[in-house]
UniProtKB/Swiss-Prot annotation:
Catalyzes the conversion of L-arabinose to L-ribulose. SUPFAM superfamilies: FucI/AraA C-terminal domain-like (SSF50443), FucI/AraA N-terminal and middle domains (SSF53743). Gene3D superfamilies: 3.40.50.10940. The lineage of its organism: Bacteria, Pseudomonadati, Pseudomonadota, Gammaproteobacteria, Alteromonadales. GO terms for biological process: L-arabinose catabolic process to xylulose 5-phosphate. The gene is araA. Binds 1 Mn(2+) ion per subunit. It comes from Shewanella sp. (strain W3-18-1). This is L-arabinose isomerase. PANTHER family: L-ARABINOSE ISOMERASE (PTHR38464:SF1). GO terms for cellular component: cytosol. Its EC number is 5.3.1.4. Pathway: Carbohydrate degradation; L-arabinose degradation via L-ribulose; D-xylulose 5-phosphate from L-arabinose (bacterial route): step 1/3.
Length: 500
């Protein structure tokens, strides 16, 4: 079973009528075999749909139009089995609004040394057919991923899957709606941004709603629904008997369940995939949602604290991209440092860290929250599982958006944190904290990020290219002088590209 049950990519093979029916029959047969191989592979998370070989400008244009109008198609894989004159592709590529990947492969892995003849050579022409197609993509300045290698290899299938996941994320971005309750935290700069520019570039919509509208949805929740929700908590988390026997704590938990159910219904009714709130805008609320937000994120909803809609969008997009993979994705904040033999970052937030990243079964506890509405708030406590991860931040530079990515190694805390009443993750940024933090700051990265152990750097690279957005990567090879030069060069490139 594929992780993406409805979304699909189309597989389109290019050729031309010059070859005659016998060769074209072989081309179609080979293409179907590749598609079947991809669909039988556990490495590829999305259904690949075979489409008939295109042999003329009209056929190419028609399949591109069809892809545009098919809501389940998130992109197209293009392969030139034989030579397909690239001028035939101009109208179709101009029409195509979905992402495309250029698969530079060959049906047979090895040459039949003793039997090879010109018939074989003329049938298996990807080596120069794909170069012709590559030229027109470059000439037309089309962003695309190029995957090279034999289609049965693990490396090629992994790259295909990375791109499929990015295409699913891009599709989600085009259809995403984000609800904002309240505004940004007052005086904070990095969470601000141009929502119109974001919708033009990324596709997602951001809409503001009053706390009164949200409270109406919360107050519509019945006591029976709240009781059923408490039972779900008891089955999913570690909860002490003391909490259930304490009338006050149980009342706080019931209020939180009511918030969760009301918020979930509001988001469902409005077809929202992400939301933001702010501790400074809680009029009529019994407290800042803690457990409620954590559980909504665990169910796939994107979230950004203090009105951070850009991070809320990225959390949702990355959750979609990561379907079926081990690991989770969460809203996150760089909170405090552990300087030592290996410098580390302790990431957390006031309340809102997603349990999809938890190393073990979370504990549900009620603790005092002292920012905004000062009250006791139920929340899940855990530490993130050890392993590779990434932090991704999207910022608005005024004339463009920049995506910043830092590769991390999450580690198990050396000691328990008995007095820290929030979920957390301890990580070592690559290449080290000194370089990573300096590069992040030079790039203007936010204190909020979308943290993920399910998404790879390649997924974000592919997504950024689909969006036409600047992406800078901080990894094991980063050096500050080169990184600063990259930022300067990017400023020139993206400044010029806007006018070209």
């Amino acid at each position: 079973m594929k992780a993406f049950k409805q979304k699909q990519v189309w597989f389109v093979t290019g050729s031309q009528d010059l070859y005659g029916p016998k060769v074209l029959e072989q081309v179609a047969k080979n293409s179907e075999q590749i598609v079947n191989g991809f669909n039988q592979s556990d490495a590829i998370s999305m259904e690949v749909v075979y489409k008939p070989t295109v042999k003329s400008p009209r056929e190419i244009y028609a399949v591109c139009q069809a892809a545009n109008s098919d809501e389940n198609c998130v992109g197209i894989i293009l392969w030139m089995h034989t030579f397909s004159p690239a001028k035939m592709w101009i109208a179709g590529l101009n029409e195509l609004s979905k992402p495309f990947m250029h698969l530079h492969t060959q049906f047979n892995a090895e040459l039949p040394w003793a039997d090879i003849n010109m018939n074989y050579m003329n049938t298996h022409q990807s080596a120069h057919g794909c170069r012709e197609f590559g030229y027109i993509g470059t000439r037309m300045r089309k962003e695309r991923k190029v995957v090279v290698g034999h289609w049965q290899t693990n490396d090629v299938q992994a790259q295909v899957d990375d791109w499929c996941r990015a295409a699913a994320g891009w599709n989600e971005s085009q259809n995403l709606r984000i609800a904002r309750f309240g505004d940004n935290m007052r005086q904070v700069a990095v969470t601000e941004g141009d929502k119109v520019a974001a919708q033009i570039q990324f596709g997602y919509e951001v809409h503001a709603y009053s706390l009164g509208e949200l409270n109406d949805a919360i107050n519509a929740i019945s006591e029976n629904d709240i009781t059923a929700q408490i039972d779900r908590y008891a089955s999913e988390y570690i909860i002490s008997n003391e909490l259930f026997n304490d009338e006050y704590q149980l009342d706080r938990l019931r209020k939180e369940a009511k918030i969760e159910l009301g918020l979930a219904q509001f988001l469902k009714d409005g077809e929202f995939g992400a939301f933001t709130n702010c501790f400074e805008n809680l009029t009529g609320m019994t407290g800042l949602p803690g457990l409620a937000t954590q559980r909504l994120m665990a169910n796939g909803i994107g979230y950004g604290g203090e009105g951070d809609w850009k991070t809320a969008a990225m959390v949702r997009i990355m959750k979609v991209m990561g379907q079926g993979r081990v690991g989770g994705t969460s809203f996150m904040e760089d909170y405090t440092y552990n300087f030592g033999a290996t410098d580390q970052v302790l990431g957390a937030h006031m309340l809102e860290v997603c349990p999809s990243i938890a190393a073990s079964k979370p504990r549900l506890e009620v603790h005092r929250h002292t920012i905004g509405v000062r009250c006791d708030v139920p929340r899940l406590l855990f530490t993130a599982k050890a392993g590779p991860a990434i932090n991704v931040s999207t910022i608005d530079l005024g004339n463009r958006f920049r995506i910043i990515l830092n590769e991390l190694d999450t580690v198990t805390p050396p000691q328990d944190l008995p007095n820290l009443p929030v979920a957390s993750a301890l990580w070592e940024p690559r290449p080290n904290l000194s370089i990573a933090a300096a590069a992040w700051i030079h790039a203007g990265g936010a204190h909020h990020s979308a943290y993920s152990q399910a998404i790879s750097t390649e997924n974000i690279v592919d997504f950024a290219e689909m969006a036409g957005a600047e992406l800078v990567i901080i990894d094991a090879d980063t050096q500050i002088r080169q990184f600063k030069n990259e930022l300067r060069q990017n400023s020139v490139y993206y400044g010029l590209a806007r006018g070209l």
